Amino acid sequence: MMSDTLRAVLLGIVEGVTEFLPVSSTGHLLLAERFFGLGEDGFWKSFAILIQLGAILAIVALYFFKLSRVAIGALTNPDDRRFIIGVLIAFLPAVIIGLIAGKYIKALLFDPWVVCFSLIVGGAILLWVDQIDLKPREHDATRYPLMMYLWIGVAQCLAMIPGVSRSGSTIVAAMLLGGDKRSAAEFSFFLAIPTMVGAFVYDFYKSRAEMTSDHLGLIAIGFVVSFITAMIVVKAFLGYVTRHGFVLFAWWRVIVGTLGLIALALGK
């Protein structure tokens, strides 16, 4: 029988690998939880959200100097101030939709069947966007037009449906709006910071009374594993998509979604 410590390590790896790839970390974690037999266990559902902070801190570490430059530059540089405003504008739609409909979305859509269908549909869209002849106009994620930030934020709301992928929806939106592949991926990383920190704080507050010392130890393990894994994956991901695009990730989504549907149909 699998120990809780091993589950925490494996889920931390799944989170770290999938969080910033356009494959849906939430979808993969839900399928992994089902595979591990965690069912409706409230702690493990919260665990999947809480360990996202490890992946987020990996982005902060990797982009520390760039983010610090922007933060300091915002005092005197209007372009840096504008970027910070742009991130907040992109973050706002998710806050509004999350507060209004978050609990209904979780109740109605957090289902393995929804995850699998979303993985397949999202994979087809990602494949289409990667193949069409887009003409990038924007090559610096910190200098996108303000309306572009807003529409990327609106697209991020689609990721509240498990299996859609937060990074996938924001990357696709940025590319359709004129961003190149690298800057689209980078802005998706930057937008993840306020979005996922907000989700972490909200879920930790809701589940704080149920946490035990054993739970905190498991969360710490998942946190560290997701941090290390995300550090490795993000550096490799940027170089890969710049050279090869998103075809690999699109097909991965389609294959995982299809296998998931087959397993569900067979009652696995």
Swiss-Prot record:
A GO-annotated cellular component: plasma membrane
TM region positions: 47-67, 83-103, 109-129, 144-164, 184-204, 218-238, 246-266
InterPro entries xref list: UppP
Alphabetical keyword list: Antibiotic resistance, Cell inner membrane, Cell membrane, Cell shape, Cell wall biogenesis/degradation, Hydrolase, Membrane, Peptidoglycan synthesis, Transmembrane, Transmembrane helix
Keyword Disulfide bond included in the entry's annotation: no
Membrane topology: Multi-pass membrane protein
UniProt-listed Enzyme Commission number(s): 3.6.1.27
Catalysed reactions listed for this entry: di-trans,octa-cis-undecaprenyl diphosphate + H2O = di-trans,octa-cis-undecaprenyl phosphate + phosphate + H(+)
Pfam families for the chain: BacA (PF02673)
Keyword Cell wall biogenesis/degradation (UniProt): yes
Main location: membrane
Compartments (UniProt record): Cell inner membrane
One biological process term in Gene Ontology: peptidoglycan biosynthetic process
GO terms assigned for molecular function: undecaprenyl-diphosphatase activity
Function noted in UniProt: Catalyzes the dephosphorylation of undecaprenyl diphosphate (UPP). Confers resistance to bacitracin.
PANTHER family named among the record's database cross-references: UNDECAPRENYL-DIPHOSPHATASE
Family per record: Belongs to the UppP family.
Other observations noted: Bacitracin is thought to be involved in the inhibition of peptidoglycan synthesis by sequestering undecaprenyl diphosphate, thereby reducing the pool of lipid carrier available.
Protein name per the record: Undecaprenyl-diphosphatase
